[in-house]
Design a protein with these regions (language model features):
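Helix-loop-helix junctions that connect adjacent transmembrane helices in secondary transporters/permeases
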Residues: 39-120
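Short acidic, glycine/serine/threonine-rich loops at helix termini
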Residues: 47-50, 104, 133-136, 164-170, ...
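A glycine-rich phosphate-binding loop feature that marks nucleotide/adenosyl-phosphate handling sites
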Residues: 37-44, 79-95, 157-161, 198-221
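A short small-residue
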Residues: 1-2, 43-45, 163-174
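Short, surface-exposed charged micro-motifs
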Residues: 110-114, 145, 208-210
């Protein structure tokens, strides 16, 4: 069964929905893949409940890649005229899973960054590493936002609520997306503070300074 860590019951519901879609396509005499292409959300579709908008043609892209990977079309054509008690089949199932739980509930995350004397940073966030690799993703995001090497980012992976910033939890495919935004915003604030101080030391304009790979550089000549 799909619990809170595996899709919130979506696989069960989609099994029924996609099976029904196959039955409808068969009743209409339609190719099941082409019928799906007709009814999936097109580019520009806006969901009135979540207010999310589909900006990319990813449904058709994943169908194309999946069909190519398993040789779908060749198998589908070969299996059309089988006889006997044992037969082979090939199918297509497609669904969209939302990230996080908005607008059902408010989403938020928090982050704290500390700059060490050696130029490395410590990052604390309320989101929990439970084996899905989010600490690695957070370190990459923090490094990119601040402008330092990945190796100089230390994630404090101890979600003790006495000392850790607030976070809503590890569920609903939310951590990288929601937690990542708080890390990005905090990293940009830290970077701005570093460069503002660098302006005082170098007498350069703020627009001519950037933080790249852990070094403060002049934008004009690198």
């Amino acid at each position: 069964a799909a619990g809170a860590m595996r899709g919130y019951g979506i696989p069960q519901a989609m099994w029924a929905g996609e099976s029904h879609l196959d039955d409808v396509a068969k009743a209409l005499g339609r190719n099941p893949v082409e019928y799906r292409r007709q009814v999936v959300m097109p580019v520009g579709y806006r969901d009135e409940f979540s207010k999310n908008e589909n900006y990319f043609d990813t449904f058709n892209q994943v169908m194309d890649k999946g069909m190519e990977a398993i040789g779908y079309q060749e198998k589908w054509e070969a299996y059309q005229h089988q006889t006997g008690p044992v037969r082979r089949g090939v199918g297509m199932a497609l669904f969209w899973y939302n990230t996080a739980v908005w607008p059902i509930s408010l989403e938020s995350s928090s982050c704290r960054m500390v700059l060490n004397q050696d130029g490395s940073i410590q990052v604390q966030t309320g989101e929990t590493e439970i084996g899905q690799g989010c600490d690695t993703a957070y370190a990459q995001m923090a490094a990119d936002a601040v402008g330092i090497p990945f190796e100089d980012v230390h994630i404090v992976s101890t979600q003790d609520t006495d000392i850790t910033p607030f976070g809503l939890g590890a569920y609903a495919s939310r951590q990288t997306y929601i937690g990542g935004f708080s890390i990005r915003q905090t990293g940009q604030m830290l970077k701005e503070r570093i460069l503002t101080y660098a302006v005082e030391l170098t007498r350069q304009t703020r627009a001519n300074l950037d933080l790249i790979d852990g070094k403060i550089v002049r934008v004009s000549d690198g």
